[in-house]
Amino acid sequence: MNNRVHQGHLARKRFGQNFLNDRFVIDSIVSAINPQKGQAMVEIGPGLAALTEPVGERLDKLTVIELDRDLAARLQTHPFLGPKLTIYQQDAMTMNFGELSAQLGQPLRVFGNLPYNISTPLMFHLFSYTDAIADMHFMLQKEVVNRLVAGPNSKAYGRLSVMAQYYCQVIPVLEVPPSAFTPPPKVDSAVVRLVPHATMPYPVKDIRVLSRITTEAFNQRRKTIRNSLDNLFSVETLTEMGIDPAMRAENISVAQYCQMANYLSENAPLKES
């Protein structure tokens, strides 16, 4: 039997499809999301409706974004979900979540079992709309969740950690084994909750500057920042900010990265693109 076939649908590798089928895990995720009528619930990648059905049962309306044309068509004809659903058959990377929030008249509650092959770029896309998002609950590769929650001085700490924690409070919810999916992925999975900060703990003047600094630092994470960021900061400037030039990218806190970004914004601002 082909283990890529589930409920008559052949899982497509190019879409990174792994379908959740463990009832206990599904119920645990839905309980964590706790959807309520009247909320602007948005699911990314509903697939074969493992989460869509139990979430939809609690709602009058649900918005879903599904790239796979066949799966979108199945949802349209779903026996009880169909009338409740607003279906966008498109790539979530092209969705303007700000416009969607404006249409629905409130901040979005976004959730989904994200395709692991696009989860990181999709998270960065969503971070740019955090002013339009109330919270997010995602099933991700466990290694990605570890990176999201990691603090300084750990191998998992990287650019994703800094940017996620700049925008959101990051809370791990539960771990999920490969056996909970069809076909089973080759990696462990985990569910994470991301809640955009109501007030930014470390506001930056220009997010592009923070993005540039973290990219350059972590692209050369084994180098000390006196070397990896020598095109941006002198040793004297780092020392004046109270940041040890002998530290590596993984030793620097989110607050310190934001401090560095604001210094650069004030003293060497990026040109408008």
Curated annotation (Swiss-Prot):
GO terms for molecular function: 16S rRNA (adenine(1518)-N(6)/adenine(1519)-N(6))-dimethyltransferase activity; RNA binding. One of its GO terms (cellular component) is cytosol. Its EC number is 2.1.1.182. InterPro entries: KsgA/Erm, rRNA_Ade_diMease-like_C, rRNA_Ade_Mease_Trfase_CS, rRNA_Ade_methylase_Trfase_N, rRNA_adenine_dimethylase, SAM-dependent_MTases_sf. Its main location: cytoplasm. The keyword Secreted does not apply. SUPFAM superfamilies: S-adenosyl-L-methionine-dependent methyltransferases. It is found in: Cytoplasm. It catalyses: adenosine(1518)/adenosine(1519) in 16S rRNA + 4 S-adenosyl-L-methionine = N(6)-dimethyladenosine(1518)/N(6)-dimethyladenosine(1519) in 16S rRNA + 4 S-adenosyl-L-homocysteine + 4 H(+). Specifically dimethylates two adjacent adenosines (A1518 and A1519) in the loop of a conserved hairpin near the 3'-end of 16S rRNA in the 30S particle. May play a critical role in biogenesis of 30S subunits. NCBIfam families: ksgA. Belongs to the class I-like SAM-binding methyltransferase superfamily. rRNA adenine N(6)-methyltransferase family. RsmA subfamily. PANTHER family: DIMETHYLADENOSINE TRANSFERASE (PTHR11727), DIMETHYLADENOSINE TRANSFERASE-RELATED (PTHR11727:SF7). This is Ribosomal RNA small subunit methyltransferase A. It comes from Salmonella newport (strain SL254).
